[in-house]
């Protein structure tokens, strides 16, 4: 059962939401446009606001549902975490798109909302505050990732300490996926949310 949960979580994460929205609404391949990501930000810039919101909600749902499925069928915290990581892995490296997906910010948010809604909302709060101040989605995502392990430790303390280490791994993964954005930020070449790349 545990292996099945992990496999289903990966397939769930692999659902190419942004790619399908781009193809259906504008007949475009997001992998070849803008940032090349299939996430909500690239959808926003190349398809529109409402499609981007739909993609964001579904991508959050992928991480959340994966963990909830694990919580329903097992009481093993490790399997819950692996299910969430599997959904994130599927989102970044989807089997349907030959491994070219998104950056897992929304799916990661869904995962941590399911593990601890306080941690998830606190991280979302950091994202929104930085976005409001700077208009850089990438910087907002990186900032939320940096604060994530601290929120996990603050809200959970010694309880489920393994969650802290997983949050650290996810944070590092998100930052790594934004490495080209970091380079552009340092060069002053990064696009703001209302700018096309």
UniProtKB/Swiss-Prot annotation:
Where is the protein found, in the record's own terms?
Cell inner membrane
**Which SMART domains does the entry mention?**
G3P_acyltransf (SM01207)
Q: Does the keyword GTP-binding apply?
A: no
Q: So where does this one cross the membrane?
A: 1-21, 50-70, 77-97, 111-131, 136-156, 157-177
The record's section on InterPro entries has:
G3P_acylTferase_PlsY (IPR003811)
Regarding the membrane, this protein is recorded as: Multi-pass membrane protein
Q: Which UniProt keywords apply?
A: Cell inner membrane, Cell membrane, Lipid biosynthesis, Lipid metabolism, Membrane, Phospholipid biosynthesis, Phospholipid metabolism, Transferase, Transmembrane, Transmembrane helix
Q: Which reaction does it catalyse?
A: an acyl phosphate + sn-glycerol 3-phosphate = a 1-acyl-sn-glycero-3-phosphate + phosphate
Q: What class of enzyme is it?
A: transferase
**EC number, UniProt record:** 2.3.1.275
GO CC terms, sorted: plasma membrane
Describe which pathway this protein belongs to, using the record's wording.
Lipid metabolism; phospholipid metabolism
**Sections of the chain in a coiled coil:** none
Question: Which GO MF terms does the UniProt record name?
Answer: acyl-phosphate glycerol-3-phosphate acyltransferase activity
One GO-annotated biological process of the protein: phospholipid biosynthetic process
Its quaternary structure?
Probably interacts with PlsX.
Q: What does this protein do?
A: Catalyzes the transfer of an acyl group from acyl-phosphate (acyl-PO(4)) to glycerol-3-phosphate (G3P) to form lysophosphatidic acid (LPA). This enzyme utilizes acyl-phosphate as fatty acyl donor, but not acyl-CoA or acyl-ACP.
The similarity comment for this entry is: Belongs to the PlsY family.
Q: What is this protein called?
A: Glycerol-3-phosphate acyltransferase
